[in-house]
Amino acid sequence: MVTYVSALFYGFGGIVVAGVALLVAFQEKLVYVPVLPGLSKSYPITPARLNLIYEDIWLQSSDGVRLHAWFIKMFPECRGPTILFFQENAGNIAHRLEMVRIMIQKLKCNVFMLSYRGYGASEGYPSQQGIIKDAQAALDHLSGRTDIDTSRIVVFGRSLGGAVGAVLTKNNPDKVSALILENTFTSILDMAGVLLPFLKWFIGGSGTKSLKLLNFVVRSPWKTIDAIAEIKQPVLFLSGLQDEMVPPFHMKMLYAKAAARNPQCTFVEFPSGMHMDTWLSGGEVYWKTNLQFLEKYAPEKRKEDTGR
């Protein structure tokens, strides 16, 4: 009996040790997936394929990494709001072009699509601190442009992009007018137990019962729950209730954390929305929700205001 129990104990311990070793060695490959299986790192299409007016933008992050982006306008002199768009963790910005094409039509906006370092045509390798620098470089570029209304820059982020957007919005209260989060997680620490269930006993955020013994090994914790609590700008939360990747209660927790300090928070649920298709399954309600938010919190300047 003792031998059996000992074998069971050591067997379980071996599994945990092996799992932790894999986490330490390959965690970036779990969090950041620039290349989808069976596809190449390059863009399968460009905005030109969808007859969109765009610029190829090359930026340099503060640590010297060369970044690529697309700046897409509804028409050359569009002075509507500008959406700074942050994608999920997998694939590249070309895979979001169809959604962005509809976004431009429905919201009458410009869209700036950034390729994180290591994604698409951008150089370097993805990391949390690196991507935070990349996002700042994109915002600084937009803030310095003279062909857009820089008082109407709104950050949009889905999943990982929401974590990126939350940090950027928190750090730039004078440059970002509002934030839109869609199907975003509370933290990678909380997601570890979702992706690898045995890790929930060892890795977790402040709101979990995890022992948190291994939190220190996570190099990209992306604590959205902490960033959201410090944001003073308006925030729209878009939650797909059929999200198969990020449990929908993550969005509810983010909203509760934000709304406790920020009265300009709006939470909208989409009953049939999954992780990637909430914008599609939500139909006109989805776009109307976004449009109303922009009209309220990133409104067009009145002529008397611009004349002052």
Swiss-Prot record:
It is found in: Cell membrane. Its EC number is 3.-.-.-. Disruption phenotype: No visible phenotype under normal growth conditions, but mutant seedlings exhibit enhanced root wavy growth and curvature in response to gravitropism and phototropism. It comes from Arabidopsis thaliana (Mouse-ear cress). It is a single-pass membrane protein. This is Alpha/beta hydrolase domain-containing protein WAV2. InterPro entries: AB_hydrolase_fold (IPR029058), Peptidase_S9_cat (IPR001375). GO terms for molecular function: palmitoyl-(protein) hydrolase activity; serine-type peptidase activity.
